[in-house]
Regions:
Chain A
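Glycine-rich phosphate-binding loops of nucleotide-dependent enzymes
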Residues: 2-261
Length: 261, 342
């Protein structure tokens, strides 16, 4: 393990309890730089909870989190963001009443001093947002459209642009295609491939195996809050992954050093 | 940068639906200027009904002077409503701020301190509202501020023995009832105070990070939180500002009447909410403009004025204001539906 390329994320034995509910019972997860990892599992398997731990929204009940080999403790999403870990939430974390550029820069707006005042530099923010959308080749009629006037896929693109606007090393996406029309799904998946070419690691949660097989390098399955199986995409069949989701597997798919009992 | 993998991605990922763009533009126009049209309509109606009185500079100045205290209450209420909150305590806060100044005046406290007192009292009440809401994890600001409505009114009566106090110093009265001569025109001081407050609020909401975060919180508090915005701190600032403006409002009212009276501002929170809603702000947060609130206040002020001039009974005025609130919001809903389905 130690000899390999440095892992951007290494989560060890993460557990998370909500009162009497145990959502995660000792989950391991690794991510290499620029890798696209698919995470699958049945409803309630703990996928979203795990991602919220990685992105600082939840604090783990126990377990260790290492970013680039360094142990970290995230108190809030802001801490995770400072380490380059961004999340696109399942329930899109956009403010529909604000413009596209305002959403992309929310919480990180550029300001300029005017006398004793610090005012938002709207022009600079618009330019930054446009530049970033161009980089991702997301084309907008106008960044001053309100996000609520956009379609689902368009919003998803804004959410992804938001997540990658500031030196993201890892973008975590929780079912980014769940609410999208077929054409839009394809565009979002291509956007994920784009991120990979920019050296950004992606963790993708999806119930759609088509998505997983289209963009991922590796897939891991959670089952009832624990690691169940994982494999590089080239070494696994769709039917096996479907089996994992339902809790069936062949012995040799067991992840190294975990859950072999 | 590395070349991207998929050129066809360049497609219309974020692409406004062509035909809906015109209606969006029309809606944006209505969003911005709809209430101003309403002000014009009210003006035309008033003029038609009372041609010789309505446009007299005396009457206009009166409308402004009478609505100045409501304007400040509504402005504070607006900040709160943008966050999808509500502050039911502003009427009581106004009274507490006003009576605090009056009581101190009787005790012989010099006027500069009297003038600062309502601001301090209002801000303190607002801070308690904000801290109570966030630190005690109140399920809704309705509850915290409903409690405060009673607390502040009770305190108002306690410090004053429940009786009015008159004889406020001339400096205080000047703020509420005095005029400044600017370019040969007499402008009520209270009107200038209102305009400056609205201009500052506009600058704050549109051009500071905290101001933009207030809108973001109203639009989607979860989004604000995960963006690293300190939602609780922002809410405390908003309720404190609302209290500050209620205190200022109390000062103006004290100045206009030259006294403090413990029943001041009873029900004023509802007028303030009405003005904000008539002004086009959404009760669900994230929507509305300072200019709209100003127009909403004017509509209420002009309507009262028109009904007074026409000798319509006060009770009918209440009925009519109720009808106008419902009609305006219903029209707004229809307009949005039409825009959404086109
Ligand atoms: N905030 C919370 N409080 C209490 N229980 C929670 C909370 N969040 C998640 N859980 C519970 O933890 C378990 C895992 O939920 P999670 O949302 O992580 O599943 P998931 O794999 O993302 O499912 P889905 O595919 O339906 O999105 C579930 O039993 C859920 O009810
Ligand atoms: Mg989930």
């Amino acid at each position: 393990m130690e000899a390999a390329a440095p892992l951007v994320i290494e989560a060890r034995a993460i557990a998370k309890r909500f009162g009497h509910v145990t959502a995660l019972r000792g989950v391991d997860l690794t991510l290499e730089p620029g890798e696209v990892l698919g995470v699958v599992g049945d409803n309630g398997a703990g996928k979203s909870t795990l991602m919220k731990v990685l992105s600082g929204l939840h604090q783990p009940s126990s377990g260790e989190l290492l970013i680039n080999g360094e142990a970290v403790r995230f108190g809030s999403p802001r801490d995770a963001r400072q380490r380059g870990i961004e999340m696109v939430y399942q329930d899109l974390a956009l403010a529909g009443n604000l413009r596209i550029d305002e959403n992309i820069l929310l919480g990180r707006e550029r300001t300029r001093a005017i006398g004793p005042l610090r005012l938002v530099d709207h022009a600079a923010n618009v330019a930054l947002a446009k530049q970033h959308l161009d980089k991702l080749r997301i084309h907008v009629k106008s960044v001053s459209q309100r996000v609520e006037d956009l379609s689902g896929g368009q919003r998803q693109a804004v959410a992804i642009a938001r997540a990658t606007a500031f030196d993201a090393k890892v973008v975590i996406m929780d079912e980014p295609t769940a609410a999208l029309a077929v054409r839009e799904v394809r565009r979002v998946l291509d956007l994920i491939k784009d991120l990979k070419t920019h050296g950004i690691g992606v963790i993708l949660i999806s119930h759609r195996l088509d998505d997983i097989f289209y963009v991922c390098d590796r897939v891991m399955a959670l089952f009832r809050g624990a690691n169940f199986a994982e494999a590089p995409l080239g070494e696994v069949e769709r039917d096996e992954v479907i089996g994992w989701i339902m809790g069936n597997k062949r012995q040799e798919d067991a992840p190294v050093g975990a859950g072999a009992n | 940068m590395t070349e991207a993998a998929s050129p066809e991605l360049a497609g219309e990922l974020v692409d406004a639906d062509q035909q809906s763009r015109r209606s969006i533009r029309l809606m944006a126009f209505f969003d911005r200027f709809g209430v101003l049209l309403l002000v014009l309509v009210m003006g035309a109606l008033s003029y038609a009904a009372q041609p010789e009185v309505f446009l007299s500079s005396n009457n206009i100045a009166n409308i402004f002077r009478q609505t100045a205290f409501l304007a400040l209450l509504a402005l504070g209420q607006f900040l709160v409503i943008v966050t999808a909150g509500i502050d039911l305590s502003v009427g009581s806060t106004l009274a507490l701020a006003m009576m605090s100044a009056a009581v101190l005046s009787v005790a012989g406290v010099p006027w500069p301190i009297l003038i600062l007192t309502p601001f301090a009292v209002g801000t303190a009440v607002g801070l308690v509202n904000g801290l109570g809401l966030t630190k005690l994890h109140m399920p809704h600001p309705f509850i915290m501020t409903l409690g405060m409505l009673n607390i502040a009114r009770g305190l108002t009566n306690l410090i004053s023995g429940g009786v009015p106090i008159s004889g406020l110093p001339a400096e205080v009265r000047w703020l509420g009832a005095g005029n400044l001569v600017l370019g040969g025109i007499e402008i009520p001081v209270s009107v200038i105070a209102v305009i400056v407050s609205f201009a500052l609020a506009w600058l704050f909401l549109e051009h500071t990070r905290t101001g933009r975060h207030i809108y973001a919180i109203g639009g989607n508090p979860q989004a604000a939180r995960v963006s690293g915005i300190n939602v609780d701190r922002t809410l405390v600032i908003v309720y404190a500002l609302c209290g500050l403006l209620a205190g200022f409002s109390g000062l103006l009212l004290a100045g206009r009447t030259g006294s403090g009276f413990p029943n001041a501002g009873i029900g004023a929170e509802l007028d303030a909410i009405s003005a904000v809603i008539i002004g086009g702000a959404s009760f669900f947060g994230g929507r509305g403009t300072v200019l709209g609130v100003f127009a909403g206040v004017l509509v209420i002020g002009m309507m009262r004025n028109l009904l007074n001039l026409s000798n319509v009974q006060v009770f009918w005025q209440q009925v009519l204001i109720g009808v106008v609130i419902i009609a305006i919001v219903a029209f707004d809903v229809l307009r949005r539906r039409a825009a959404a389905s086109s």
